[in-house]
Amino acid sequence: MDSVIQEAKRVIIKVGSSLVTNDGKGLDANAIQKWAAQIAQLRALGKEVVLVSSGAIVEGMQRLGFDKRPVGIHELQACAAVGQMGLAQIYETSFRQHDVRTAQILLTHADLADRERYLNARSTLFTLLRLGVVPIINENDTVVTDEIKFGDNDTLGALVANLIEADALIILTDQRGLFSADPRKDPNAVFIHEAKAGDLKLEAMAGGAGSSLGRGGMLTKILAAKRAAFSGAHTVIAWGREDNVLTRLAGGEAIGTQLTAQTAQLTARKQWMADHLQTAGAVVLDNGAVQKLTAEGKSLLPIGVTDVSGSFGRGDVITCIDQGGRAVARGISNYASSDARRIMRKPSADIAAILGFVEEPELIHRDNLVLL
């Protein structure tokens, strides 16, 4: 098995907190200098690199004198604000030794959910890469309330991969990769060298009840690989303390677990819809509508909707849910939630009589719908 990183031209590298900090006591300058040296070598090979790095909160705790991770959200946000200064400084210093310029970009999921801000972020990143800069991205923990949690930057890395249509996502962690079970508890645990991104068996393995892999954050990494595959990006999950792991991957060596993207690449517009972590509302579909969407590639008609939840407007992205509660698609609604409730279960020919107007015969047109 050859590494998919060797042929990749544009790579997202996600480095977790445990790899850039001294056991939770501030940033590890030596480790960060090693990352910078390896990334500089990747750039010398002609690769464009974007780095997604955690570590701001831990650095802020050190600077503000916290012995333990604060419980209060505002204390965490204060740590993130203070620590982000140190994170940016040490990366800039480390990359400068290799004559590489860096840029700091702080994002929230809301930035990528808004179409205009999404396109602006995309254009800025493309410009930075064209200018030879290594963008260093982190979640803007200072202003968010529900994204300060373990593993969230795995998702952010996948979103950035989709945003700029990267060829590969490297998730560096404190574990060797994926196992079929917890190797510390199960002597029969098998290391997974390669699998398909989006394989439901992997999700079940990592997220089952009592799964140590799930508690260790492996489920977020598996889901991140699935998300990155929307844009055709392959994912490698590897132990970050492996000597020269990045340069060896770039040289073709197979390290860690490789999750290959085997789904058709989405258009930029459909990538944006798929990357909505939170949607304005949802519609529940009957079995016939699910079949039409998933197997036949049809539009969603009002007659196939059995329930509407949330408050959304025309043009908002909503989730389509099957009778079992599973999200099967996302799409742009042609009708506000109040109107959708009135026309659900009704044939499209009745829309004008019910509402007094017709926007479209479909609730969601197939061109504005993406399967999950």
UniProtKB/Swiss-Prot annotation:
Coiled coil: none
Designated name of the protein: Glutamate 5-kinase
GO molecular function ontology, one term from the record: RNA binding
Positions of substrate binding: 54, 141, 153
EC number(s) recorded for this UniProt protein: 2.7.2.11
EC category: transferase
Disulfide bonds: none
Main location, first listed in the record: cytoplasm
GO CC aspect terms: cytosol
Pathway annotation from the record: Amino-acid biosynthesis; L-proline biosynthesis; L-glutamate 5-semialdehyde from L-glutamate: step 1/2
Function: Catalyzes the transfer of a phosphate group to glutamate to form L-glutamate 5-phosphate.
PROSITE patterns: GLUTAMATE_5_KINASE, PUA
Keywords, in A-Z order: Amino-acid biosynthesis, ATP-binding, Cytoplasm, Kinase, Nucleotide-binding, Proline biosynthesis, Transferase
Compartments it resides in: Cytoplasm
Stretches assigned to the PUA domain: 280-358
SMART domains noted in UniProt: PUA
Gene Ontology BP annotations: L-proline biosynthetic process
